[in-house]
Structures are given as structure tokens and as C-alpha cells.
Design a protein with these regions (language model features):
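Active-site hotspot residues in diverse enzymes, especially metal/ion-binding acidic/histidine motifs
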Residues: 2-263, 268-402
Length: 402
């Protein structure tokens, strides 16, 4: 069915409602039966309409348009005579559905476990409200209102609508979390610049070293949250300036010890060298496939490598990397964990050679994981199913640094 209606002066655009609905159901993983139940439309009729087409009542079309976020007002004038005398109500359920699927990437939220796989619409609303502490799902629009530059750039940064929804969800959670943590320490750039020079030494303590660095940074006015990878975002890290203080997100995407430190130092580079630009653009996201045009990612990567192992020492790595006892000796001499040597060596190779060398040195005996390092500082609202609880746990952890 195409919605088409001519009046004396206006011809309304042909819109294949059936095709739009098919795409919507497929992209969001919604069963026809669930949509039919929620909209109060006979399931067999809706299935037949989607597969074969045919006539559909105007009131039913309006419900579907609301779910698809098609403005019904565009068509109401042309169909106003059809509206008169109809006894079928257009309920709020279609509006609820439209809100949910226009604001949230439901399939991704199911994938990360925030929403149960077979949850119905009411259950989806309840689970999202429980996560945020909402009384009503519509509170999402006024929750953690992002600064104008932050919001406009987030919509510009991710062009696909599906990614944009997950990206905004991610940003809202983080922005709200940083605001609630509310680091009381003033940002001390000079001390940060000096401290960064010594961060490599903390890598030798694979259990408490990373935690100690995070707490020192907090005292310097830099708040760092370390999170598991959130499906649908593809972000290695991010830096925001909130209330005049740097706020950093490190994503434990690869679960590799050396990557954790490289990601942290990468973001600290931007704080030290791009602070004024960060204030103007509101935030910076580090991602492999979409480099930031405002900031120099190559310089940040080089800085991170140099802060862990200086260039002159890195030049010696190809000669010793095959001999584990030499790697251990070098690690002790330059005060880093052996895993850092293997990791930095691999990161410095071109992609073709890196793949071959990774097969030799990518095992857990060379590249250790991050589980021990981030145990006490992991920020995992998704795992806890509760954003407020995750924030409170981090606030308690940061209190130990004051």
C-alpha cells in the first residue's frame, strides 16, 4: 500500500508504508506478533499486510506511522474525511513504540544484556527505567542533557541512525556519570605533565599499578573511567571537558594490558596538547575507523609509545624479542612489565608484519590480560544493570584517593 491522497491544491508524496515497516522490523529485530499485540492490530492481518500488501484502515496506518516516526499530520488533511466517524482509537502505545525505537538501539541493548532477549515492550520500558532510575521512559530526553557542541557533534560524528542512538546512549551515561562523580580537585596541568613522564614505572605492578595511576590522576583533577567494551559504539577511548576539568573514558576493548596503558596515555596526550581545542569541540573520541579530524591521532599514538618505551630502546626490540630471557632483562632495565615490551614491539610494526609476529607473541604468556589491573576501577553499569550503583561504586573508590 502507498499512502497517496490528492486534495484541490496538494498532492501528497507516495510512501510505501509496508516497505518502511518491513525495514523497521528487520533492523530492530521485532517480531510481527509483538508489534501487532502492542498496537492492537490482528496478528494474521498484519503478517498478511507485510507479506502481500493490500488495504489498511487509516487508524491502523496512523499507528504504524507513529511507530516509524512518520509525521501523521502530513497525511491527516488528505484523509480527514476518513477520520470522521471512526470508532477505533489511536492509542498511546504506538507513540511509546516510536519513542523507544527512535531513542534506543534495542537490538544492541539486548546484545549487551541490558534488555532481555524476548522482552515485550512494557518489559523493555521497565528494564531501561530501572537502569537509569527513571519513573517514566520519557525522562530520557531530559536526562544528562548534553552540551550543544557535544550533542551536535555526536550526531555529526556517527551518520548511521542505528549507531547514533547507541552513541548518544553511551555519551549520556558517561556525561551523567562524570557530573555525579564531580571531582573536587582542581585540574593541575603542570603536575600532570610531570606525572605522565613516570607512568611507565607503574606498569611493573600488574595488579595495583593501573589503579594507583587512576587515583593519582583523580587528585590532579583528571577523572578516568575504565569500562568494558559497549557493543555498538566501537570506541577505544574518549576525552571530555566538563566544568573545566578533563574527563577520560578508557574502553577495555582488547583486554590486553599494554593496550590499556597505550589508550590512557593517548588520551592524556590530548589533554596536554589539545586542551583548548577540546574545550571548543566538547569531546574527542578515539576510534580506529573514524579518526578525529580536529586532533592529531598519529601524534597521540607516537606519544603513548614513547612514554612507555623511548624510541632508542624500541629500536633494540627486534634484536631481543625472540629471546624471552632478554626481554625480561630489558623490562627490568627500563622499568616496565615484560608484556609492555611485547605489546609495544607489535604496535610499532606495519599491519602485514604485525599479523605474522602476533602469531608468535600474541599468546597470554607474552601479552597478559587486564583482569587484575582493572578489577578495582572497572566502571560497568551494564554488567550491574544499574547506572546509579556503578557511579556510587566509583565515587567510593575515588574517595580513597582524596
Amino acid at each position: 500500500m502507498y499512502i497517496l491522497k490528492k486534495t484541490n491544491n496538494i498532492e501528497y508524496e507516495n510512501v510505501s508504508l509496508r516497505e518502511e515497516l518491513k525495514v523497521f522490523l528487520q533492523s530492530n529485530g521485532i517480531p510481527v506478533s509483538a508489534l501487532a499485540e502492542q498496537l492492537g492490530i490482528d496478528r494474521r492481518f498484519l503478517e498478511r499486510y507485510i507479506s502481500e500488501g493490500g488495504d489498511i484502515k487509516f487508524a491502523q496506518a496512523i499507528k504504524i506511522m507513529q511507530v516509524l516516526d512518520i509525521e501523521p499530520a502530513k497525511f491527516i488533511q488528505g484523509f480527514k474525511n476518513d477520520l470522521e466517524g471512526t470508532s477505533e482509537e489511536i492509542t498511546d502505545e504506538s507513540t511509546n513504540l516510536s519513542f523507544l525505537y527512535s531513542r534506543f538501539d534495542i537490538p544492541s541493548l539486548k546484545e549487551i544484556g541490558l534488555i532481555k532477549k524476548r522482552a515485550k515492550i512494557d518489559e523493555i520500558k521497565e528494564q531501561i527505567c530501572s537502569f537509569f532510575g527513571f519513573q517514566n521512559i520519557y525522562e530520557y530526553d531530559t536526562f544528562a542533557i548534553l552540551p550543544e557542541a557535544l550533542f551536535s557533534r555526536s550526531t555529526r560524528y556517527i551518520k548511521e541512525q542505528k549507531s547514533a542512538r547507541m552513541n548518544e546512549f553511551w555519551l549520556k551515561c558517561l556525561y551523567h556519570s562524570f557530573k555525579k562523580i564531580d571531582n573536587p580537585n582542581p585540574f593541575d596541568r603542570e603536575l600532570l605533565e610531570e606525572f605522565v613522564k613516570h607512568i611507565y614505572e607503574y606498569t611493573t605492578d600488574e595488579i595495583h599499578g593501573y589503579e594507583k595511576v587512576i587515583l593519582v590522576l583523580y587528585n590532579l583533577g583528571v577523572t578516568v573511567l575504565t569500562q568494558p567494551y559497549v557493543s555498538g559504539t566501537g570506541k577505544y577511548g574518549a576525552t571530555m571537558i566538563i566544568d573545566g576539568k578533563p574527563c577520560v573514558v578508557i574502553t577495555d576493548m582488547n583486554k590486553k594490558y599494554h593496550k590499556l596503558w597505550l589508550s590512557l596515555l593517548h588520551e592524556l596526550y590530548h589533554i596536554l596538547n589539545d586542551y583548548d581545542m577540546l574545550q571548543k569541540i566538547a569531546y574527542h573520541i578515539t576510534t580506529k575507523d573514524n579518526p578525529d579530524l580536529f586532533l592529531n591521532e598519529d601524534s597521540a599514538d607516537a606519544f603513548a609509545l614513547n612514554m612507555l618505551i623511548k624510541q632508542s630502546d624500541r629500536e633494540e626490540l627486534p634484536q631481543i624479542i625472540r629471546l624471552s630471557h632478554m626481554v625480561m632483562k630489558a623490562a627490568k632495565a627500563i622499568h616496565v612489565h615484560p608484556s609492555i615490551i611485547y605489546g609495544v614491539y607489535l604496535e610499532g610494526l606495519d599491519s602485514k608484519k604485525q599479523s605474522a609476529e602476533f602469531r608468535k607473541y600474541g599468546s597470554s604468556s607474552c601479552l597478559i590480560g587486564t583482569e587484575k589491573a582493572i578489577k578495582n576501577v572497572i566502571f560497568d553499569p551494564i554488567g550491574l544493570q544499574d547506572l546509579r550503583k556503578a557511579i556510587e561504586l566509583m565515587r567510593q573508590e575515588f574517595k580513597s584517593a582524596v
